Amino acid sequence: MDLHNIREDYSKRELSEGDCADNPIEQFERWLDEAVRAEVNEPTAVNVAAVDGRGRPNSRMVLLKEVNSEGFVFFTNYHSRKGRSLDAHPFAAMTFFWPELERQVRVEGRVERLAEKLSDEYFESRPYQSRLGAWASAQSEVIPNKAVLVAKAAAVGLKHPLHVPRPPHWGGYIVIPDLLEFWQGRPSRLHDRIQYRLLDGGWIRERLSP
């Protein structure tokens, strides 16, 4: 398959240092708000990359559930491949891509498990069927067929017809950033790249060559 001629020329917007907030979390919130208002498809979808105990990289898409002054929060099965990788090497890289705005954001940082109380609170807010699924799915494990999964979910529903407690193997992670990069597509591949680096407790903002 020849893909050489598939390309886009970006020209919608530009990003100058003067446009950027001093704090990268504030800058991210600005861009996320713009993505939501522009009705970008799945604006909170983010690729999370991690490295397992053998040094082998792996990545997947998850949904960002919170961003605050501490970092970026998402939830998953702790026994999944990504969960095992993050526990073995507690660092991650995240990439948001908003093609409608010709933008992407990269985040790198240390990863910690979220406090159990916070994981409990979010789990309680999930739809009933999603809570059943968290118990039924041994995420990333091989199963003989889909019927096994459906049967397990049904069994959990019979056991917990009203209230489904959070499984101990399911909860949140927070990525505590030490680097963020904001990328704005520009004509002739002369893209705008503004990077924030954490140094001695403060953020250094700098422009990168595209």
UniProtKB/Swiss-Prot annotation:
Catalyses which reaction(s): pyridoxamine 5'-phosphate + O2 + H2O = pyridoxal 5'-phosphate + H2O2 + NH4(+); pyridoxine 5'-phosphate + O2 = pyridoxal 5'-phosphate + H2O2
Cofactor: FMN
One Gene Ontology term of the molecular function aspect: FMN binding
UniProt entry tagged with the keyword Nuclease: no
Function: Catalyzes the oxidation of either pyridoxine 5'-phosphate (PNP) or pyridoxamine 5'-phosphate (PMP) into pyridoxal 5'-phosphate (PLP).
Record-linked Gene3D superfamilies: Electron Transport, Fmn-binding Protein, Chain A
Protein name: Pyridoxine/pyridoxamine 5'-phosphate oxidase
Organism the protein comes from: Neisseria meningitidis serogroup C (strain 053442)
PROSITE patterns membership: PYRIDOX_OXIDASE (PS01064)
Pathway named in the protein's UniProt entry: Cofactor metabolism; pyridoxal 5'-phosphate salvage; pyridoxal 5'-phosphate from pyridoxamine 5'-phosphate: step 1/1; Cofactor metabolism; pyridoxal 5'-phosphate salvage; pyridoxal 5'-phosphate from pyridoxine 5'-phosphate: step 1/1
EC category: oxidoreductase
UniProt GO BP: pyridoxine biosynthetic process
Family from the record: Belongs to the pyridoxamine 5'-phosphate oxidase family.
Chain residues that bind FMN: 60-65, 75-76, 81-82, 104, 139-140, 183, 193
Keywords (A to Z) from UniProt: Flavoprotein, FMN, Oxidoreductase, Pyridoxine biosynthesis
Gene this chain is encoded by: pdxH
SUPFAM superfamilies listed in its UniProt record: FMN-binding split barrel (SSF50475)
Enzyme Commission number(s) from the entry: 1.4.3.5
